[in-house]
């Protein structure tokens, strides 16, 4: 059974245009000086998400306890009020539990589709696309969030993704400031910190920041 997200555009079209503004979209490319980001103006719609599930399998409520976490990738979840898509799939129960927090604390949120942000990171000779777990809007910020097993936080791939996303958020924030929009923050969140007693603001301590590179001194 194939679910599509076309129907959300009639309901949320104007809101999507507001949230998914072009300061959110950037392209990374590698130069001698490192990663550079170009952010253009304009608007873009959310990418259409297609979900495949077994015939006859209903969507589960996102707050329902998952008794078989190993099967969660095969499951479809609904019952959202603040998600920009009516249905979502999760790669882990940690993601589902984080979505519960977003439903409570965020203004709006969604799980980006491939190609939505076009963030690329360097891993050896490859430059794969990085797709973060969540993007959420709050009163003060727009948060890009990755939830990850604590044991994997310091791996080369996770750190490369975090560095690319943090730099993307810094450039997006610079552009947002020029047009009066909210700044972006990238959060790399350990899985064992995702508990319902936490508030979304509590996760700001896991922010990964990209600092502007100092200019090289010029010789006379």
Question: What positions do the PLM features span?
Answer:
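Phosphate/adenylate-binding glycine loop and adjacent helical scaffold
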Residues: 134
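Intrinsically disordered, low-complexity, repeat-rich regions
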Residues: 1-128, 137-143, 148-220
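Active-site lining segments that contact anionic ligands and/or coordinate catalytic metals
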Residues: 131
């Amino acid at each position: 059974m194939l679910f599509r997200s076309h129907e959300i555009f009639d309901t949320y079209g104007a809101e999507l245009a507001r949230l998914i503004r072009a300061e959110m979209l950037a392209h990374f490319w590698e130069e001698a000086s490192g990663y550079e980001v170009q952010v253009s103006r304009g608007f873009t719609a959310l990418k259409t998400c297609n979900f495949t599930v077994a015939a006859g399998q209903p969507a589960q409520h996102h707050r329902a306890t998952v008794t078989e976490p190993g099967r969660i990738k095969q499951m479809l979840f609904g019952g959202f009020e603040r998600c920009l898509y009516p249905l979502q799939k999760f790669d882990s129960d940690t993601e589902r539990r984080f979505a519960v927090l977003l439903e409570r604390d965020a203004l709006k949120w969604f799980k980006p589709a491939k190609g939505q942000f076009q963030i690329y990171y360097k891993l050896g000779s490859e430059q794969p696309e990085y797709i973060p777990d969540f993007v959420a809007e709050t009163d003060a910020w727009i948060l890009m969030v990755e939830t990850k097993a604590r044991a994997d936080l310091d791996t080369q791939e996770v750190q490369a993704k975090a560095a690319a996303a943090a730099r993307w958020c810094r450039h997006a924030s610079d552009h947002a400031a020029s047009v009066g929009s909210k700044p972006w923050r990238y959060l790399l969140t350990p899985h064992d910190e995702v508990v319902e007693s936490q508030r979304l603001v509590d996760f700001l301590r896991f922010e990964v920041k990209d600092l502007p590179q100092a200019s090289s001194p010029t010789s006379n």
